[in-house]
Amino acid sequence: MNNRAGCLVTNLSGEMAYQSFRPNPLPPEPPIEMSNELIAKLIDANRRLATLDGLSSRIPNMDLFVSMYVRKEALLSSQIEGTQCTLDDILNPFAEENTNLNVSDVVNYIRAEEYAINRLQTLPLCNRLIKETHAVLMEGVRGQEKNPGEFRYSQNWIGGQGSTLRNARYIPPNPEDMVDAMSDLEKYMNGEDSLDPLIQAALIHYQFETTHPFLDGNGRVGRLLITLFLMEKKILSAPSLYISYFLKMNRVEYYDRMTQVRKTGDYEQWVLFFLQALSDSAEDAIQTIDRLTEIHNRNVQKFNSMTKRQQTNAINFLIYLEK
């Protein structure tokens, strides 16, 4: 395998020999082909994200809305990795004290996302921030023994339970190539590129997942990078998008599309899929905001028809619900 996306590299020798994938730096060469289909999807995704960002700034109780969306994204992203947990578990006011490892995984994702968003105010989207976020994600949960906050020093692989280097579905870059790949990715995230930021986000997510720099937690960090990059590029002013629902519902295609890039160098089919994920996710969020605004307006009308005492009781009740 030697194509636009990278090549296979033989490691060790004899019976111990195996091949890992060495990704080429971004952006792809030759450049992404801007077909009519891709341009149409790009315009649609940008339009919906702009609508979402405009609406999200006007929604009643923005902090509560974002808090719920962060929890929903954390849950769905963790479920993609096989975490067995429900939204009720996460909304439980005692979730942080829950000893259930599945709940702890999701609670840590919430902490990691909040940490990373705050850290973006003082750091660019860089490997230091990625490592710090990973450390928060893995603190005190399954995988905490796998060097949280540090890039791996050993070879990892992707496959079913009990798989080995010999029968793995995919073997990411060896440790030396991984360090080079993450250095290249850091430069790309902070460099100048004529590509639209949404296409850049697609490439960055693919490249991170392909590089798999950690021993555990790569998928969750990779999906979190999407939100962080869109916020850094001012596409989103708040984490009001949960793309993991689309990726979970299309999980097989999600993985197959990235595999196709590695095998054939066809970035375009991956970018098309990613743009569709952004469009559908943004539209879902827009509809949610519309419904919440409608409910809010109905409640305001009811509130205005109440007596002073009823209004006071209603306000206290709503404050209680929002805690």
Per-segment meaning from a language model:
Residues 1-323:
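FIC/Doc superfamily catalytic core
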